[in-house]
Every structure is written in structure tokens, then in C-alpha cells.
Amino acid sequence: HTDAKLKVEVESHNLMDGAARGASEGVMLALNIGAVLMAFVALIYLVNQGSTALFGHSFTEIMGWMFRPFAWLMGIPAQDVAAVGQLLGTKTVVNEFVAYASMSDMIQAGTLSPRSVTIATYALCGFANPGSLGILIAGLSGLVPERRKEITQLGLKSLVAGTLAVFMTACIAGILG
């Protein structure tokens, strides 16, 4: 049995001071997150435009091609692999909201089978994208600035882990469906 001693530094002098400091720090954290999110969105746009200029295809489209084998492994029918791969690319490069909006258009057009819709719903349900990574880095770095290097080093790993986690869930949906 070990006794742990925790020393808490109190920076506030009373309830009103604590509330004011908390509100101030909260606003600064929100502004930091907003600024980093805008920077990441601008970076995504830059990469997509640069890729289109260099290769004739956006980075989102290229990622869609790269995700086709994953779509197939999840159990997506062959006729829908390209469309779902594109949705996965959109989710990974942009975000899940844009991907779900695209999937909604595909559902209304009748281009996706019900099985593909079910599996893709699970595969798109995650926050593994650059915008969310920016929020994570800004939020955690604002709370523990001395660990910023460690947080940024884990960023890419967290994207991969988050993507694989939702893909595994989609695989289970594919097996059960």
C-alpha cells in the first residue's frame, strides 16, 4: 500500500475569481481550437487543389481509390465498392458529415444496395479525419502545453486507430448483415 500525495495549486482566490478564470481559459481554448480547425480545413483544401492540378484528381478521390480494397473486405458488394471507397476517402480527408451527405444522395438516387448502406453507415461513423485531429491537438495542447510534442506525435496513430476501429465495426455489420 502506497500513499500518494497530490498537490493542487489553487490559482483562484474565491468563487468569482475562479469562475472568471475558468470562463477566460475556456474562451481561449475555444478560440485556439477554432483557429487550428480553420488551418486544417485550409490545408485540406490546399492539398486537394494541388493534387488536382498535379494529377488531375483530388486527394479525396485518390484516397477513395485506396479505400476500395477495405470496402470490399468489409463485405460491400462488388458493384458498390467504388462508391463506398469514395465515401471512405471523403470521410477520411474531409469529414464524416460530408461523406454522409454524399451517401444520402446515393441512397436517394438508388445507386447503393441496402447491404452497402448498412455497412457504410458503420464505416463512416467516426471522427478519424484531419479536422478532428486538429481539434484534438488544439484542445489537449491547450490543457497540457508541456506535452504538445507527445500529442502531435500520436496524432497520425490516432487517425489510423480510429479508422481501423470503425472499419472493424463495419466488418461485423457485414458479417451479421
Tell me the role of every PLM-derived stretch:
Residues 92-177:
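C-terminal transmembrane helix pair
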Residues 1-4, 44-51, 132:
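Short acidic (Asp/Glu) and glycine-rich catalytic loops that position anionic groups and cofactors
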Residues 1, 50-57, 143-147, 175-176:
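Membrane-interface elements of multi-pass transporters and channels
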